[in-house]
């Protein structure tokens, strides 16, 4: 049979791949994990976190920057920061910290996480804490408290001109500062300029008026930029990056303390088996552009900071569902109903049209057909109908299996996996709490190596109970 799902994948992509393969029984493996065994043990719907992938991604980026620094004989240092907002879970942050990284925060409560990490001896007071975001007093006061208690590398990134006054009043020791440069948005965005940061044309004057001359109290150490579009090889990205590089060169001539550029994050992750992105090329170009501009301006090369969130944690997670029903609504539309909801578990699919890498776990030798995946809520937008590489979804057929002589085919549902879902989905959906149509949060399983180097799995959170929801709603 040539029209099986296996043949479709192998004709469309290079398969198997490093992180996806079929085992001898025909079931999909994810980073070598036997997903079917985990389904048999825990059931579906299931959220799966594979923690070793986090360290692999961090060290991959570090190695590529090291290669670029050697290629260009770059004289600064590289500092990898993890954005806690991508996934705040302790098991994620602590896994990332095992790889000698720094942290980026975005809200007041992030600072409470920093305090807990210090109490657990997961960090010391020399770690860089890059504090982003528009800051209310609850945030600035916590930042000040960190600095006042001896955290020497806390860098509040000024989002507006008034923010500095808050630190002047509350910080008792000399401290470092950064400035976020307001980037121009890409042409298709609803706004011309980012709401975050200070306008580039105002920064030199702001430095002279408010920072210069106070170096014994605070020093401007970092320029920061982040582009919503991410790090892409196009005119828009290089134009915005060169603006901050040129601004650094101008400021450096009057601000000798300035020594770092933070280019933010934005590395894409794999959302299709056909994903192609030359990370090393982009890093080489970024490093080369910074060096070239600094040489031309005759200023020292800055240290380079990055803030990778999705790149760090995104590829470490998967959501696994069962197809619990099939509905044919007309001659062209065939629905596979899953045992959960896209709106409540993968909100980016609904909110911004995000596409994740989707593959069936089983039935790869069945014929395939075009389908639409439907969630369990009553909302008409709870569906998934296209992939990253094509505006359709193809999955193995499940019809006529009752006529099969294979007893497994009769009883085993089709399992569908959405992969590389580790960034932002729980943060946007909320963990527990009240969900649309009271759809419960799925169980969450973690896979990691134990102290003896053996791969183990355990349940971090059970499926949400009705009682937990009723209590929040005031019925219990």
Name each model feature, range by range:
Residues 78-260, 269:
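Active-site-proximal beta-alpha core segment in soluble small-molecule metabolic enzymes
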Residues 1-138, 370-372, 391-427, 432, ...:
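N-terminal capping/small domains of soluble enzymes
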